[in-house]
């Protein structure tokens, strides 16, 4: 391998391992094992959670409607429900997500 190719490879690796490596994740689509790796790096030891399945969320929304909780506008948990229903795959694989959006999926220590 030519010396300049070797140098280019080393520089590319250093750029990925540098202090802005977390920001590199936020500027690309994260799918499959790349998404899982990004979550492990973002959440650290606290780990990350898997949102409830869609049926559980729909049941919760029906219960809220029956109790009249939707009449007063969005409830405090509305954003959380929207995030869970939308899902991390939609946020980070189909679209580009930020570091802060990844942190929303971390367990609270």
UniProtKB/Swiss-Prot annotation:
GO terms for molecular function: hormone activity; identical protein binding; insulin receptor binding; insulin-like growth factor receptor binding; protease binding. Residues 56-84 form a propeptide. SMART domains: IlGF. One of its GO terms (cellular component) is extracellular space. The keyword Signal applies. Residues 1-24 form the signal peptide. It holds the Pfam family Insulin. The keyword Secreted applies. Disulfide bonds join 31-93, 43-106, 92-97. One of its GO terms (biological process) is positive regulation of MAPK cascade. It is found in: Secreted. InterPro entries: Insulin, Insulin-like, Insulin-like_sf, Insulin_CS, Insulin_family. Keywords: Carbohydrate metabolism, Cleavage on pair of basic residues, Disulfide bond, Glucose metabolism, Hormone, Secreted, Signal. PANTHER family: INSULIN (PTHR11454:SF9), INSULIN/INSULIN GROWTH FACTOR (PTHR11454). Belongs to the insulin family. Heterodimer of a B chain and an A chain linked by two disulfide bonds. Insulin decreases blood glucose concentration. It increases cell permeability to monosaccharides, amino acids and fatty acids. It accelerates glycolysis, the pentose phosphate cycle, and glycogen synthesis in liver. This is Insulin. It comes from Octodon degus.
């Amino acid at each position: 391998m030519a010396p300049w190719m070797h140098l280019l490879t080393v520089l590319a690796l250093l750029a990925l391992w540098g202090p802005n490596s977390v920001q590199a994740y936020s500027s690309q689509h994260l799918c499959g094992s790349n998404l899982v790796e990004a979550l492990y790096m973002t959440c650290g030891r606290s780990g990350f959670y898997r949102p409830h399945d869609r049926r559980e969320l729909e049941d919760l929304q029906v219960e809220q409607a029956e109790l009249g909780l939707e009449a007063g506008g969005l409830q405090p948990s509305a954003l959380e429900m929207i995030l869970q229903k939308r899902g991390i795959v939609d946020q980070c694989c189909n679209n580009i997500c930020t570091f802060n959006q990844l942190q929303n999926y971390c367990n609270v220590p």
